[in-house]
Amino acid sequence: MQKLQIFVYIYLFMLLVAGPVDLNENSEQKENVEKKGLCNACLWRQSNKSSRLEAIKIQILSKLRLETAPNISKDAIRQLLPKAPPLRELIDQYDVQRDDSSDGSLEDDDYHVTTETVITMPTESDLLAEVQEKPKCCFFKFSSKIQHNKVVKAQLWIYLRPVKTPTTVFVQILRLIKPMKDGTRYTGIRSLKLDMNPGTGIWQSIDVKTVLQNWLKQPESNLGIEIKALDENGHDLAVTFPEPGEEGLNPFLEVKVTDTPKRSRRDFGLDCDEHSTESRCCRYPLTVDFEAFGWDWIIAPKRYKANYCSGECEFLFLQKYPHTHLVHQANPKGSAGPCCTPTKMSPINMLYFNGKEQIIYGKIPGMVVDRCGCS
């Protein structure tokens, strides 16, 4: 009996030391674990978002074949941007991105930018030293984007100053050649006649596809061109070297090249937002702001929706990848787990300055995440 009393006293003492028992302790611990899991998921998503932003900066420079971002100031950009219809059209009707991901197709993209339009401004040439007299305008250098693609359209754009009275203007585009025995230094490319009325000046385009193709085949024949636009009184209305107040009115070439068609296949995935509690692999929204990067050399878009992938890839969700599941079942410790990665990427169109201060309009593949999946 005495032993029983001693046991009871010891039991009561242990209860006093342990304190009151909380019946909700297990549920609170479970809730804390769930909150910690959600917090870890948020941190993981934030890490993926930051990594995606840095990867985008590297990818853009790499796909544009630029070692570093072009160092062009905002003031220089304002002076270099031509105030011309084709450029305004590209900016005003700019298709920032194609977010038609509902079809679930996966593009087999090339890595580098697919150029669609190149706007080339005139520059100086050492070849002009071979002739006694330099032309009034102009010499154009062509990047590898033009040289290595099929040219489908090439137009020379010139600006004609306004007139005070109605007049007929005779426009002539001449190609500079090496002096011949009879002293001839020019050969005609195009000529046209147009009527101008008083008012503002006008932009006029001239087809130069044939001469451009000849220049690409024989680069040594590209010595430059001369532009003349004479009214009935013999006044030259063409802006070749802009005067004060005529910034952005330089002549320029607009060249369009072929685009490579893409193949596609089917694919599907989950879409989530930043407040989602979904743990599985999912696509999350992410907006890239080029102005925040300090990348003023990108004319358009100033920002675009890039998106990113984040989430778990449990083998429970991998009916789509049976081979991965079988490998894991055979060797669960030795096989690497699947990762949440993009399974559908789409391009963006971009208008930008390259390192030679040329304006390029191109399509950059693989810049928008449209679908995410485990692989």
From Swiss-Prot:
Record-level GO cellular component terms: extracellular space
Post-translational modification: Synthesized as large precursor molecule that undergoes proteolytic cleavage to generate an N-terminal propeptide and a disulfide linked C-terminal dimer, which is the biologically active molecule. The circulating form consists of a latent complex of the C-terminal dimer and other proteins, including its propeptide, which maintain the C-terminal dimer in a latent, inactive state. Ligand activation requires additional cleavage of the prodomain by a tolloid-like metalloproteinase.
Presence of the UniProt keyword Transcription regulation in the record: no
Residue ranges the record assigns to the propeptide: 19-266
Matching PROSITE patterns: TGF_BETA_1, TGF_BETA_2
One Pfam family from the record: TGFb_propeptide
Region forming the signal peptide: 1-18
Site location (Cleavage): 98-99
InterPro entries in the record: Cystine-knot_cytokine, TGF-b_C, TGF-b_propeptide, TGF-beta-rel, TGFb_CS
Keywords: Cleavage on pair of basic residues, Cytokine, Disulfide bond, Glycoprotein, Growth factor, Heparin-binding, Secreted, Signal
Predominant cellular place of this UniProt entry's protein: secreted
Compartments, record wording: Secreted
Function statement: Acts specifically as a negative regulator of skeletal muscle growth.
Quaternary context: Homodimer; disulfide-linked. Interacts with WFIKKN2, leading to inhibit its activity. Interacts with FSTL3.
Protein name according to UniProt: Growth/differentiation factor 8
Gene name in the database record: MSTN
